[in-house]
UniProtKB/Swiss-Prot annotation:
Protein name: 2,3-bisphosphoglycerate-independent phosphoglycerate mutase
InterPro entries attached to this UniProt entry: Alkaline_phosphatase_core_sf (IPR017850), BPG-indep_PGM_N (IPR011258), Metalloenzyme (IPR006124), PGAM_B_sf (IPR036646), Pgm_bpd_ind (IPR005995)
Positions of Mn(2+) 1 binding: D403, H407, H462
Keyword Manganese: yes
Keyword line: Glycolysis, Isomerase, Manganese, Metal-binding, Phosphoprotein, Sporulation
Organism placement in taxonomy: Bacteria, Bacillati, Bacillota, Bacilli, Bacillales
Subunit structure, as described in the record: Monomer.
The keyword Manganese belongs to this UniProt entry's keyword annotation: yes
Cofactor needs: Mn(2+)
Residues of the active site: S62 (phosphoserine intermediate)
Family: Belongs to the BPG-independent phosphoglycerate mutase family.
Function: Essential for rapid growth and for sporulation. Catalyzes the interconversion of 2-phosphoglycerate and 3-phosphoglycerate.
Native source organism of the sequence: Bacillus pumilus (strain SAFR-032)
Length: 511
């Protein structure tokens, strides 16, 4: 039986902007894209910042883009999720935080705050520490100690004193908190099982062992004098005038670890929480029975409470298609294959019933500017054959070229990449239209639209520019103000499938 497939075609890294200088998207000859743009209803979508669950003004990326597209809802990344919770007042109602604080207060125990001391926003954000200090004050805690991990990697390599100053001012203003230890993230945030490093951080925090200082700034100055910058500062103990450590982590204390990214938080957390820990000798007096809180789910091996539990991504587009008995195809070359499968399915590896996948190998070249067409022609050939064989009701396709070649920051190869993709796009969309089907032509974020910086240097990063959306349905009208989360509801709409309640995005096709 002849199928009338609906396809979601993602031109990866294909952003739109008016200025043509350094803009491969604007400079490329793309007769097929232009033809569909002129012939069919079209709009632009926001693919960056809070519209995709990132902080305001932050550029999108392929993982985040495909996650939002497949989920049909804004998927808040951890940083934004915590920021929004602080902004909306949900943070101070968080039961996991309140339980840790109540426990400390009722049992006359200390609260220790562990985490990376910067505003890098990759592993942590210093504003989250300040929010915890405010909450601790509100809850009437007095014994609150900070074990700060110095960054120098996601921020400038000699910026520790900037953050220590901010912390000092906040402690003064809020009226609670003392710095107990400082260590470079090289030690406290190792993820490569270099346990000798972790042990140094642990012994400073649990036993008060290591270089000692009365003044937090002396830790940094001393290190700088020895050519040791923030990331590598040796775990150091802050002491009172009598030489005693300000605080050690003791039996039964509360801990809140405010890093939200798990990978570099797991080892030090295991050291404090794991009964069966054997990676080094923690000593007889190691702190036991801690009320340990992780900001997000770090790992099954970490014995702790989780403040921001994983978000459930049920009823992504693939699951909805499967529930409705529709056959679906995911197709891309190697570079973007995980995006149309794993990320599009909300972080699920396995196929849904009725889901087929075609992986086309990306070319074996050092960098893709050497072969701008990549494997687009092979992707196109495989897909056109599939369309003509009437196998699938829904198709999700990614052309990697504008993004992967765009990362070279080289204009000419990126123009060639887009011209190759345009040729393939024409063959695919025309095959779909010939079957009476529909295509949604769009992108996940910008990149190829800016290849030269204002200083005239190569620009290799993503952009915050809007992305196109074309729906090949004559007579339809697309609404303005759309976001990536609206694409799956639009695909379901074309297939006559009702979107599930979990999808808060809405079809772009105006009724």
């Amino acid at each position: 039986m002849s199928k009338k497939p609906a396809a979601l075609i993602i031109l990866d890294g294909f952003g739109l902007r008016g200025e043509t200088v350094g803009n491969a998207v604007a400079q490329a000859k793309k007769p097929n894209f232009d033809r569909y743009w002129n012939e069919f209803p079209h709009q632009t979508l926001t693919a960056s910042g809070e519209a995709v669950g990132l902080p305001q003004g932050q550029m999108g990326n392929s993982e985040v883009g495909h996650l939002n597209i497949g989920a049909g809802r804004i998927v808040y990344q951890s940083l934004t999720r915590v920021n929004v919770a602080i902004r909306d007042g949900e943070f101070e109602k968080n039961e996991t935080f309140l339980e840790a604080m109540t426990y400390a207060k009722e049992n006359d125990k200390a609260l220790h705050l562990f985490g990376l001391l910067s505003d890098g926003g990759v592993h942590s954000h210093i504003q989250h520490l300040f929010a915890l200090l405010k909450l601790a004050k509100k809850e009437g805690l007095t014994k609150v100690y900070i074990h700060g991990f110095l960054d120098g990697r996601d921020v400038g390599q000699k910026t520790a004193k900037v953050y220590l100053k901010q912390l000092e001012e906040q402690i003064k203003e809020i009226g609670v908190g003392e710095v107990a230890t400082l260590s470079g993230r090289y030690y406290s945030m190792d993820r490569d099982k270099r346990w000798d490093r972790v042990e140094k951080a642990y012994r400073a925090m649990a036993y008060g062992e290591g270089p000692s200082y009365q003044n937090i700034y002396d830790v940094v100055d001393d290190s700088y004098e020895n050519g040791i910058y923030d990331e590598f500062v040796i775990p150091s103990v802050i002491t009172r005038e009598n030489g005693e450590p300000v605080a050690k982590v003791n039996d039964g204390d509360s801990v809140i670890f405010y890093n939200f990214r798990p990978d570099r938080a797991i080892q030090i957390s295991n050291t404090f929480t794991n009964e069966d820990f054997r990676s080094f000798d923690r000593g007889e007096a190691h702190p036991k029975n801690l009320h340990f809180v992780c900001f997000t789910h770090f790992s099954e091996t970490v014995d702790g409470y989780v403040a921001f539990k994983p978000v459930n991504l049920d009823n992504t587009v693939g699951e909805v298609l499967a529930q409705n008995g529709l056959k679906q195809l995911r197709i891309a070359e190697t570079e973007k294959y995980p995006h149309v499968t794993f990320f599009m399915s909300g972080g699920r590896e396995e196929e849904f019933p009725g889901e087929d996948r075609i992986l086309i190998n990306s070319p074996d070249v050092a960098t893709y500017d050497l072969k701008p067409e990549m494997s687009a022609y092979e992707v196109k050939d495989a897909l056109v054959a599939d369309i003509n064989a009437d196998k699938h009701d829904a198709i999700i396709l990614n052309f990697a070229n504008p993004d992967m070649v765009g990362h070279s920051g080289m204009l000419e190869p990126t123009i060639k990449a887009i011209e190759a993709v345009d040729e393939c796009l024409g063959a695919v969309v025309d095959a779909i239209l010939a079957k009476g089907g529909h295509a949604i032509i769009t992108a996940d974020h910008g990149n190829a639209d800016v290849l030269i910086t204002e200083e005239g240097k190569p620009h290799t990063a993503h952009t915050t520019n809007p992305v196109p959306v074309i729906v090949t349905k004559k007579g339809a009208t697309l609404r303005e103000g759309g976001i990536l989360a609206d694409l799956s509801p639009t695909l379901l709409d074309l297939l006559g499938v009702e979107k599930p309640k979990e999808m808060t995005g809405t079809s772009l096709i105006q009724k």
